[in-house]
Every structure is written in C-alpha cells, then in structure tokens.
Amino acid sequence: MSQQNQVHSQPPAAAPTAFDGVNPCLVEDTALLPTVVDAVVDAGASILERFSPLANRPDGLEAVIAAIHANDEVSVRHLRAPLRRARPTAGWVDDELATGPLPAGEWWVPDVLEGNINHIHGMRDWSVTATLVRDNKPVLTAVHVPLTGETFTAVQGGGAMLDGQRLHPSAKSELKGAFVATGQARPGEDAATFERMGASLTAMLNSVLLARVSVPATTQLAHVAAGQIDAFWQYSDVRSGLLAGALLVAEAGGMVTDTRGRPWSLASEDILAATPALHHDLLNVLATVR
C-alpha cells in the first residue's frame, strides 16, 4: 500500500479488509490467470521430481541451505520466464524473505517453493505460488500443490477458487469450537517475536478447541479460505508468505487484518485471517499479547 494509505490507528467500524474496492482490471486479470496457473503447475512438476518422502535427508544446516537453494533454482527456471513474458513491465521480487511495501506499479511476488523446508525433509505441505501485486495490493494469485494436484486461485473482485470451485470460510461462530493455526515465518526471528508467538499460542490454547503450529503460512491461509481451519495469525511481515493466502482469504469472504484489527497491508507487522463470525473474538484473545 502506498505511503499515503497506511493502516489506520484505530480499527474501523465496518468489517476491516485491505481488499475493498472495485478492481478496474478484473477482466484483464482474469484473462491472465490461466497463464499464471500454467506457470506454477509447470514449476511444481519440476520440484515434484525432486521429492522423496524417505530419501536424501539433509544431515546438517549446510546441507539444508544447499538443498533449499537447489530447489529454488529449479523452480524459478520454470516460473520466471512465462510470468515475465505475460507481464513484461512488471517487476520481479527475488528475495522471498523481503518485507514492507513495494515501489509503485506491478510486481510479481513468487514463492518458488513455499514450504521448501518441508519438501527437503520429505513432508507434504509445500507449494509453488505466484502473486501479481499492483500498487501494493495483491490482485491475482495462483497456489499449486503438486502432491495433491490442487490449485488455489484468486483474482481481486472475482472470488477465490480451488480447482474451479468457489471457496468460503467456515461457518463457526463460537471460539470453543474453533480450530486455529499459527507458525514461524522464518529462522532467526528476534526474541521479542518468539515471546509474542509463545504468549499468543498460550492465549489461544486457553480459548479455542485446538491450535496448530506449522509451516508454511500459505498452506494455512488457503485452509482458512477453504473453511478447513477457522483462523491463522502470525507475527510476520514477510511478503511472499502472506500475499497469496491473504488474497485467497479475502476473496473467499474471510477477514484479513493485523492483530489489532486494522486493515492488513504490506505495511502491517502481523496478520490475522479468520472466518468473519470469529474475527472479533480472536482479536480480543490476541489483545492480551503485546
């Protein structure tokens, strides 16, 4: 979001979301979506060939880092070229851990292997994502999960889909029945962030039915959009891990704010994405953590 459109100091009276307004490029963005889907599916296939649930485990930090970089290099070779051809004037964000607002205009913000750490350890929660950001608003995204063949998509103003079927958040309205999730955004967070994570998890465990801690964020946000879990919160402003899922949740009809209830944007320091009927109560839980 541009500098003149920073988040509000107080929560608005209406349902807060960073995705309000008409998308003047809805038709154009919708026409672009199949190209983006093809790109993430192709990149996903290249990474699926490298996946094994049992073999080739890294034996230390250096091996972990090398495996992550090797996977990234394979995926980006399949992802970058078709997206740059489709939108040659759009910028490209290479740094998957980058934070904060982008310069004006259009940018591709991919996560060439979201959940790379899971992939190299033989676990199943990983995907390939690509999101088009226009003037700091996500307007189009595709998230492909190669192990299941599922593809989540969203266009601002056009709804969120899973393989062509429209997504909706859960219908739950009581915290005591809620299934919620959080997770670490990246290695090496500061001590204050770890303390907030721990305190918020304790607060949630005292309020909801079940709380899950897992990575990556995109998978859990997609589950919120699909009504499979009821909320996700994270003390993070890493762009590539949040943009795709935030758009999916918003277009599915969920609430996407920071943990104080202000509209979420790339200027936000944290995120809460939830089914609408639980959002206010979840804010109250997180208000105990500062």
Q: Model regions: which residues?
A:
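Short glycine/threonine-rich catalytic loop with a Thr-x-Gly-x-Asp
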Residues: 93, 119-122, 213
